[in-house]
Swiss-Prot record:
InterPro entries: Kinase-like_dom_sf, MAP_kinase, MAP_kinase_CS, Prot_kinase_dom, Protein_kinase_ATP_BS, Ser/Thr_kinase_AS. ATP binds at L29, G30, Q31, G32, A33, Y34, G35, I36, V37, K52. It comes from Pyricularia oryzae (strain 70-15 / ATCC MYA-4617 / FGSC 8958) (Rice blast fungus). Disulfide bonds: none annotated. This is Mitogen-activated protein kinase MPS1. Disruption phenotype: Leads to sensitivity to cell-wall-digesting enzymes, as well as reduced sporulation and fertility. Abolishes pathogenicity by blocking the penetration of appressoria into plant cell surfaces. Does not affect the ability to trigger early plant-cell defense responses. Affects the expression of MPG1 and GSK1. It comes from the Eukaryota. GO terms for cellular component: cytoplasm; nucleus.
């Protein structure tokens, strides 16, 4: 990795994109705050890959930690059929580098593009998507990891309806000990529309239920064709949730950790829960029953991933013998590292070790035989042009009013 030998330079979004000489860049796929992505083809095998250039890795400590977290978790989960597979990594200029290249599975589009394309999807599509999300999430949770940013844009889909979870940059560890758990829950800026109410309302700790809430929001979006809780800000987000789910009971209200937020909710007029069959009159009743259990306001009442996989709505796909747990839990000890120089060394070591692994054992890491549900996506889905709305909050909340700031920071704000 000492120089550009064995690599080629392409222009992607007007930036230099340095790739292994075996590959030719074929298409620009996207760009965002954390980097740019293109499609490429292996000139020897004709297989396609997605190459992600993570930029400005060390411009902020939070970005360096995010890159390290993503690299480690993609390796840990490598091979599960519903989690994006990491094929290779590269740091072309390791001396004082500020960018890292990740070679991953190439997928057709993300679920957000499919939903927003307006193409008709059937109940069979919904079952397939939710089942695959839950299979991937079961594997993630069994490693004591919370994804914390599940949303349609982080679910990659192929034309044959194969779905894979991506983007682990906001993931954190989970412990049954609330005090130990709380230590990992910092710098949380996950997407507002899919964010569980207990996070905004500062319940004592987070649990795996926060990811289940996000899956419920995704199911509702599939059923309705648009985001279910589309808050303009955090106060509006909370209001929209309460408007649909109704006023929480006293036991739940008493667990709201933020006094200001608790007072706000108590001072609202009583709201009755809106029946899901009224909101989604054409939906499968089993889908609405699962949705109701996923969107339980109180996380202690929310259905678990394991229970959801056994729900009647998913019986056509459910096979306990083909829904594996991760063999090992994930070690989050690196999270305590705060020195950027140390993180730079850790990322370099991770990339070097992984390159050695894939060059000596290319097939390492498989878990479970691929079996993508064969429900084709309608032609044209994901092909249309649409302007994505970004509900992600700012990294700071200093210009918000007091209640908005508390809801944005949630439990993290109190640490």
């Amino acid at each position: 990795m000492s120089d550009l030998q064995g690599r080629k330079i392409f222009k992607v979004f007007n930036q230099d994109f340095i790739v292994d000489e075996r590959y030719t860049v074929t298409k620009e796929l996207g760009q965002g705050a954390y980097g740019i992505v293109c499609a490429a083809v292996n000139n020897q095998t004709s297989e396609g890959v997605a190459i992600k250039k993570v930029t400005n890795v060390f411009s902020k400590k939070i970005l360096a930690k995010r890159a390290l977290r993503e690299i480690k978790l993609l390796q840990h989960f490598r091979g599960h059929r519903n989690i994006t597979c990491l094929y290779d990594m590269d740091i072309p200029r390791p001396d004082n580098f500020n960018e890292t290249y990740l070679y991953e599975e190439l997928m057709e589009c993300d679920l957000a593009a499919i939903i927003r394309s307006g193409q008709p999807l059937t109940d069979a599509h919904f079952q397939s998507f939710i089942y695959q999300i839950l299979c991937g999430l079961k594997y993630i949770h069994s490693a004591n990891v919370l994804h914390r940013d599940l949303k349609p844009g982080n679910l990659l889909v192929n034309a044959d309806c194969e779905l894979k979870i991506c983007d682990f940059g906001l993931a954190r560890g989970f412990s049954v000990d609330p005090e130990e758990n709380a230590g990992y829950m910092t710098e949380y800026v996950a997407t507002r529309w899919y964010r569980a109410p207990e996070i905004m309302l500062s319940f004592q700790s987070y649990t795996k239920a926060i990811d289940v809430w996000s899956v419920g929001c995704i199911l509702a979006e599939l059923l309705g064709g648009r985001p279910f809780f589309k808050g303009r800000d955090y106060v509006d987000q909370l209001n929209q949730i309460l408007h649909i789910l109704g006023t929480p009971n006293e036991e739940t209200l008493s667990r709201i950790g933020s006094p200001r937020a608790q007072e706000y909710v108590r001072n609202l007029p009583f709201m009755a829960k809106k029946p899901f069959p009224t909101l989604f009159p054409n939906a499968n009743p089993d889908a609405l029953d699962l949705l109701d259990r996923m969107l339980a306001f109180d996380p202690s009442s929310r259905i678990s991933v394991e229970q959801a996989l056994e729900h009647p709505y998913l019986h056509i796909w459910h096979d306990a013998s083909d829904e594996p747990d991760c063999p090992t839990t994930f070690n989050f000890d690196f999270e305590v590292v705060e020195d950027v120089g140390e993180m730079r060394k850790m990322i370099l070591d991770e990339v070097y070790r992984f390159r050695q692994l894939v060059r000596t054992a290319p097939g390492a890491g498989g878990h479970g035989a691929p079996h993508a549900p064969q429900v084709p996506i309608p032609a044209g889905a994901g092909q249309g042009q649409w302007k994505a709305e970004d509900p992600r909050p700012q990294e700071y909340v200093g210009q918000m009013n007091d209640l908005e700031a508390e809801l944005a920071g949630g439990l993290d704000q109190r640490r």
